[in-house]
Amino acid sequence: RQMCIRDRFTDVENFRKKIDSSYKSNRTKRKPCGFKRLLNWAKTEFECIRMPQLEADDVLGILSTSGCYTNFVLVSPDKDMEQIPCRIYNLKEEFTQTPEQAEYKLYEQCLSGDPVDGYSGIKGIGKKKAQSILNNKEGTYWDTVLKAFKDHGYKEADALKQLRLAKILHSDNWDYARERPILFTP
């Protein structure tokens, strides 16, 4: 069974824009010629899923952790998919992302930010520095991340905001009855 879940299936309303109105505001590039036609073709050939207020990444995270699907491979070159504990093919290699590795990736992205998605993390901290901080953690990852934010002059609210912007939702972050996200709290 094949499914097509693509950014253009992202809902018009995005819950992250309620957390930070500048989220993804840096994206102004137009889609390539023929993109809409390709998208319409995909909608006729594959099962396509859209969920209210969510990006395609979140839909993948929720479906992949819901228990409804087994023996699948998530195919995407997007590094954000590494927050999802499942089998992944990133167009270079296939690997299994454990829950522990997925959690680590979330906190790494919280520290380093993601300029493509438009959230900053801690200014001056990139992937390598974020990994160094996490590899020397004391307590939980959240404790370590919170300390790093405070050490750089930020408040707890800043750290939580970055974490919620970074977090790819899993099934336990989705209110199925009300069809809305449950904001992640560490």
Model-derived segments and their meaning:
Residues D7-E13, K18-I19:
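Short loop/turn segments at strand-loop or loop-helix junctions that form parts
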Residues S22:
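Contiguous, small/hydrophobic- and glycine-enriched helical/loop subdomains that border
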Residues R1-I5:
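Short, small-residue-biased leader/transition segments that mark boundaries at the very start
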Residues S25-P186:
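Extended two-metal-dependent nuclease catalytic cores across DNA- and RNA-processing enzymes
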